[in-house]
Structures are given as C-alpha cells and as structure tokens.
Amino acid sequence: MTNTSYEKLVEVYEKISSTSSRLEKQDIIADFLMYIKETDADITYDITLLLQGKIFPPWSDKEMGISTQLIIKALSNLLGESTKSIENKLAEVGDMGEISEELIKNNKQVTFFKVPLTVKKVLSNLRKTESITGSKSQNKKINYLLELYTSASPLEAKYITRTITERLRIGVGEGTLVEAIAQAYNIDKEIIDRAYMLSNDLGEVASRAQESIESVKSLTITPGKPIKPMLAQLSPGIKESITEMKKVICETKYDGIRVQIHHYNNKTKIFTRRLENVTNALPEVVEYIEEALPSKDFIVEGEVIATKDNKPISFQYILQRVKRKYDIDKMREKIPLKVFLFDVLYYDKPTAELPIIQRRQLLEEIVTTSKNVELSTMKIVSQENYTEAEKLFTWSIDEGHEGIMFKDVTSPYSPGKRGKNMLKYKPLRETLDCVITGGTYGKGKRAKFFGSYLLSLLDEKTGEYKTLVHAATGMDDDLLASLTKRMEKLIISKSEQNVLFKPKVILEIAYSEIVESNEYESGYSLRFPAIKGVRDDIGLDEVDTLSKLHQMIDLQK
C-alpha cells in the first residue's frame, strides 16, 4: 500500500472542476475510488470526506475553528506579505483559495525543508486544530497551517484553503458521490442510497462498498449516530393533499426545534435537525425523556418548544436555549421547555422502515406522557372525513402552533429525503430558508451595521449557491446588532459598501410573490421580502433549493 500524495487528490479536484458534466464528474470520482482501493484502501473513508470538502464526518460536532483571517495571518507570516495586501486581493477576487494559489506561485523564497504532502498529513494537521484552546491557540493553529503551506504547491495551497473555508467549488453534490460509489464498486445505486440514508456517512458507505455488497446492506440506523431528518414538501391545500395521499396521519406542526433523541449505553443525547449535539444545553429534556421512556436503546423524534404559562411562545426563545453554553439553570427557569414526540426510528432494533402508522402505534405504547412530554396531537384522516383535518388546523393555529402536517400512513422514514409522503400546511405568507452570501452596510445611525443581506438558494446540481434577493426589513435593533457581530467573523471580502460572506448563517424569509429577475443568479427574486428570523436549527444541507423555488412558482400559478 502506498501513502497517497495530496497532489494526486488535487489532480482529481482539478479534473472534476474542469467539466460541467455530472456524468464526467461521476466517472472521474469512480476511477479515483478504484485507484485508492488498489493502492491505499485504508484511506477510502478520508478520501470520501475530502471529496465533500470535509475533514470530519457530518454527524460529528467537531470543527476546525480556523477563520479566513487566520489563513491570511499564516500566509503573511510565511511569505512576508502584509495582511492588508492579502485582504485587498481577497476583496478583489473573492476566493481565498485562488489567493493562496497566487501567493504561493509568486513566492520567491527558497524552502529547504519542503516535504511532499500526503493526504494523511493534510488531514492530520487540520484535525489537530480542532482541539487547540487557550491563550496561544491562534499561534499553534498558524504553525499547523504553516507546516502545510510551506510544503504545498500553488494548486495544493488552493485546495487546502478551500477545504478549510468549506468552499471546495468543484461542483460535486451528494447525489454525484452516491452514483460514483455505486459505479466504482459495481453495486446498485438504490443499495448505496439506502445505506447512506440510514448511516448519514458516505465515507462509511464507500469503505464498506469496497469490502462487499453484504457489508453495505448491513448498514443501518444506530443509536448515538444521528441521521438526517425526513423532510416535508409544501401542501397545495388540505383537501388536495388528502385526496392525493388517500389516508393520512394529520398532526399539529409545532413552532420549536426539531430534535432527534438517542438513548444508548444508559445515556441520552439530543441532536438538532442539523445534527448538532445540544444535550448540555437542554438538561431538563434529558430528564423528561428518561422518565417518559423505558431504559432501552432507542431513537425518538419530536419538537421541543418554549412555553410561558404552559402556552407556546416564539421559536426564537428556544433558539436562545439551544445556543446557551453558560448559566443553563438560570435559562431553564426563564424559558421552560416542553417536548412533543411524533416518531420512533429505533426501539431495541431499527424501526424506520416500518410504515408511519406502525411507528406511531409503537410510540404510543412506549411513551408515558406527562405535562412535560406529550405525543403530537393527531388524527387519522381520509377523503371521507377530510373536514377533521380542517378542524385540527384551526385548533392548532388557535393554540399558537404553526400549522399541520400530512403523513401517508404507509410511508417508511426516509432520512434526508423531501417527498410527497410528508407535507406541511401553514397559514399566511410562504417562507424560504436562504443562506446569507453577501451584505451591504446601512446608512446614518445604522452605518456600522449590515443593513441589507444578499440571500441565496442552493443549486443542488452543482452544489453552488445562487443569489435570489436582498432583504432588509424585519430586523429589530437587537437582531441588527447581533447578526452584524456574527457576520463580521464570516467576511470573505469587502469593498466600500458591499461584503461577501462565507455561507454559514441561514435566514427564514417571508415574501408575497416570486417574480422573474435578471438581477440575480437564480433568475428570480421575491416581492416584499421580510426577515422572520435566524434558522440556527438547520444546516447548510437544508437551505432551500432551486427545485423548491420552482415548485413554489408552480403553486402560486
């Protein structure tokens, strides 16, 4: 077995980015996976991560903690160029990866200790930065970066930087990787797709695929390892949804954070829909769940809401609880929580592939309800009694909840999939979850704040973000200040008024209508956009897509 050079991976990155054809990208990745199987099979897991632009698995809560500013400092230390000069270049180009490539290419200094980089070395150095804390942590992180940049070729420097900034820009989405893994190891795509859905780990899927098809098929949901949530499409209307689905579970849609609760080895962990571990922030939820369910291995799913006088209050209050790291007991008294459970994905064994009607029955059998833990309010509805759904909708809104859900009674749980087996119906204006990719400073009293944000949707075919609209209304002074402080840490480049950001923060945007527009990359814009709030409960893989935009255009016709 060889120790695969990082240069070899970079060559693959360049080949992939040089073509716009998804099939060609798939072929390149499949060929590379076969090469790795034959020459360095132990790193298949890591290679699959790096092809996604990641260094940690998606279910891990580890992060590098390396900012663009830290990269600039490292390159400045290495090359003797001022940080201001590098910042100016970044403002002009907008891609820190390209800047890194250019700086290394133009470096006139001779390096006597240049050692060829390997995939293992790059990953090792980047992963080490995650655990560094303390007063000299920045210097230690810079030293790990310098080790890499000192030995890197210009192209290697470009992709090291892009991996750190989580913007690989090679146009590869999860779908392409699934297809490539299936092709490389000659396994049906459906088998690979199922294994990925149940494990949420393409690295694990690829590693098992190189062993055998049986190993892939044995992958399943495991307590302690969160999976992507099943997602809902928009409902065209109550009667229309029930007519199409025939028989449904109709249940209240709560305005809180969706959680996946895992109990295993006599401990309980709570994950958000973006797979973030928030167990420490919600200690009472752990207590409530351990009182409500038997001490067996299980995974249940539900919604945690904030309450006042036992009534639901704004979603933003529960976000305060989730993000809190200190004074948890004080916040626990200030913002009480309640749990509504609506699904069980594992109970002594996997249950996700059972029909939802059976999973609901199991949930009712195993949960002891209380004032702190309840099951979601639901009714089984068909075309003959669809008015029951209308009554539940009215009741849910009157009680301060968000709307209702429709779930086809025969449907299994499909992690990460958005399909017609689960629909959501809400009143008033529609919303889109958009990622902030740019901004503009305000004027007058608001000159030191970002007064408007450029928002984008995900192009699922390329993995890139396409601009959709500028939004400014809906921010009170507190949100204006807190969001500015947060976004300043994510600046990629800026001119006098305009700023580009690393895609990280997601906003929920309400609007009245989708209209065609040549001003934005998506080809559309929103009329009367208003910022409803920050969606810290979801990850970048749940940013709304161009496909959803087109679906909503069809619905408004």
From Swiss-Prot:
CDD domains: Adenylation_DNA_ligase_Arch_LigB, OBF_DNA_ligase_Arch_LigB
Chemical reaction(s) catalysed: ATP + (deoxyribonucleotide)n-3'-hydroxyl + 5'-phospho-(deoxyribonucleotide)m = (deoxyribonucleotide)n+m + AMP + diphosphate
Cofactor(s), by name: Mg(2+)
Active site per the UniProt annotation: K253
UniProt cross-references to PROSITE patterns, sorted A to Z: DNA_LIGASE_A1, DNA_LIGASE_A3
GO biological processes: cell division; DNA biosynthetic process; DNA recombination; DNA repair; lagging strand elongation
Keywords linked to the UniProt accession: ATP-binding, Cell cycle, Cell division, DNA damage, DNA recombination, DNA repair, DNA replication, Ligase, Magnesium, Metal-binding, Nucleotide-binding
One function term, GO molecular function aspect: metal ion binding
Record: residues binding ATP: E251, R258, R273, E303, F342, R418, K424
EC number: 6.5.1.1
Superkingdom of the source species: Archaea
The keyword Transcription regulation is assigned to this record: no
The protein's role, per its UniProt record: DNA ligase that seals nicks in double-stranded DNA during DNA replication, DNA recombination and DNA repair.
Family: Belongs to the ATP-dependent DNA ligase family.
Listed NCBIfam families: dnl1
Stated name of the protein: DNA ligase
Organism annotation: Methanosphaera stadtmanae (strain ATCC 43021 / DSM 3091 / JCM 11832 / MCB-3)
Gene: lig
